Amino acid sequence: MKKVLILVATVNLLFSCKKNDDNAGTFSGPDATIQQGKGKSWIKLGANGAPEQLGLTITDEALNSMPANGDESEVKLPLPAMAKSSTPFDHIEVGWNPHGHEPAGIYDKPHFDFHFYMVSEGEVAAATNTAKLNANPAADYLPQNYVPGPPVPQMGKHFIDVTSPELNGQPFSQTFIYGTYDAKVTFFEPMITLAFLKSNSNFERTIPQPAKFKKAGYYPTKMRIAKHDGVTDIVLDGFVLRQAI
């Protein structure tokens, strides 16, 4: 009987390890056309199935063909199922601003808004209620030194870090924004100039963290840019498990 129990325990352990191994690896979403190139989302999971990196990859053909004139444009990147089940994130929207945007003299450079949304595409489209656009979360759910900017319908209210270099006399190159709607954090947004993406092959920064999270899950603590093999990766990294408070 003892040998049988040991055999069963061994089989269960091997099955458990195989199950975790099946969850490990890098999983990609579908390709999307971005100007004359491509973009796609992806997630890297560790051996325990926990997220290690969540990102998007843009080809050099896309970066080199972004129009210098014309209107703003946006491309949606669906996340792979493994990303939606292992992180709070639902999809990514890549916004191109050929002339930048307000405030003048700060964010008026050609740049990308990389929205990592924690709500569905339908919820983003329905984010038009003025009261909900203007409703601020409790201070503990945003990082210190983050202050609200004007709300944008079908996005949300953008909170910016007052200690960021571009708000203290330095040129804008990259920054990290928190977005909210109905008093809840609904997106993370690395905002990065085209020039910075083209000129930096390896960049890493920390993501300011709030004291509390409304939804439990794995959240990133770093943002990275990496260029390799004719593509550029924009990566949320350093995921940490947070409890809801």
Model-derived segments and spans:
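Bacterial Sec-dependent N-terminal signal peptides
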Residues: 1-6, 11-34
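Generic marker of residues within folded, mature protein domains
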Residues: 7, 46, 104-106, 213-215
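Short beta-strand element of the conserved SAM-dependent methyltransferase core
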Residues: 17, 114-118, 238-243
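Plant-biased detector of terminal regions, especially N-terminal secretory signal peptides
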Residues: 20-23, 80-86, 212-213
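Short N-terminal edge-element motif at the start of the domain
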Residues: 32-35, 47-110
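Intrinsically disordered, flexible peripheral segments
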Residues: 34-38, 47-66, 122-123, 131-245
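Phosphate/adenylate-binding glycine loop and adjacent helical scaffold
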Residues: 43
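Histidine-centered catalytic micro-motifs
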Residues: 106-126
